[in-house]
Amino acid sequence: MALCRRISYLYALALLTVYALFLPLGGYERMMEGKYRAFLLLSLGYVLAMTALGAWKAVRWRAPMCLAALAYLALTALSAALSPYGTAVLLGGTRRDGLLTAALYAAVFLLLARHLRPDRRLLYAAAVSAALCDLLVLVQLMGRNPLWLYPTGLNYFDGDVAYSGFYAGAAGNIDFTAFLLALCAAAMAAALVRGWSKWLLAPFALTMWTLWQLRVAAALLGLAVTAVLGLPLLFPRRRRAMWALTLLLTAAAFALIWFFPGDGGTLSELHRLLHGDVDLTFGSSRLLIWRSLLPLITERPLLGGGCGTLYLRDVPPFYWQRGGEITYFAVTSAHNEYLGVLVDQGALALLAFLALLALALWRAYRHAESDRCAVAGAALLCYAVTAFFSVACCITGVYLWLLLAMLAPKEE
């Protein structure tokens, strides 16, 4: 048992450091495939090592969170078995979000939920990783090409001109980089509120500055919502007062959005939406993408099309309008992790997934007196909000299952 705990701890530490900072050869052009191979190496190695040690015998199969994870895996496997796209479900598309990835997520969660004993050192390691990523991003935002991650002669500001999208940091696409930095920022903020080491102020401030410079609306929104909804989590002894303050701040936020039209950007889009002015190009055309997926849901509502098969289905391209030019892009992701599960794995798998997420958040709030639950709960809450606008892949997804495992009941 002690060896299983040690290996689980080392695996979690590797995810927060080695994997988070891993940069594949070939730079951003090879980022997704390189990260996926690193994920397979770490996660398959961990699962096989734990299997050899007989670690599965100790798994609490009847625990509510484990049952939800097993239901999610079983329904995902059933969706894959009945998919009309054959073996394409095993690996999925270019983001490698197929059955193999989903199975590894569930296996890693079940093992970590029983054997991982998280402590402060894991957050400190994540803070160091975030700070190093911050420094890389800030240098890239100066127009430099450190570590030759961009093609020769190009830099960050060539995004959406010489190549599609914007890339920075150790996760590739700035949406992924900002997503991971937001999770670290939420966890560090919770730890600072709980009186952990003050040296966390340095990486926290650096991470917040980097997020502001990247201007990824989904990550900033995730942090803002976490700051409000996380109050009862961070101050459990004043729970009633914190819930009242949360409701007050939520009402104030809605009032601000309702009355303040903004001068462009996300705030203006939210203002127009509240007033019934719906433009499908809002959120980088996310509304257009989500609407285009509705026919796919009605085709296979219960079990979906199979893991990672959205790119094989008949979805109209979405577009961005810049000045007088319109650029079209193929839809290969739902750009919403929950909608992605609904389309690919069906409503039943989505219900199991939401049940697992709800159980974890319920534990975080119920046991908020525990620093472990408060810190992991804040990061999970940030993930749950940001995922509403995110693309599912192993670069970010593995950290969801790590956080879920941290919030699972632990036996001393």
Residue ranges, per PLM feature:
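N-terminal membrane topogenic signal
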Residues: 1-12
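Alpha-helical transmembrane segments of multi-pass inner-membrane proteins
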Residues: 10-15, 19-20, 41-50, 73, ...
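N-terminal hydrophobic segments of proteins, predominantly signal-anchor/transmembrane helices
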Residues: 11-28, 45-106
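Alpha-helical transmembrane segments and their immediate interhelical/interface regions
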Residues: 24-40, 86-113, 258-282
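Membrane-interface catalytic loops of GT-C/OST-like multi-pass glycosylation enzymes that act
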Residues: 28-33, 90-94, 171-175, 214-222, ...
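Aromatic-rich transmembrane-lumenal/periplasmic boundary elements in polytopic membrane proteins
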Residues: 104, 136-152, 259-309
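Interfacial juxtamembrane loops and adjacent helix segments
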Residues: 145-168, 268-283, 308-343
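A conserved mid-to-late transmembrane alpha helix and its immediate loop/hinge
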Residues: 173, 294, 300, 325-362
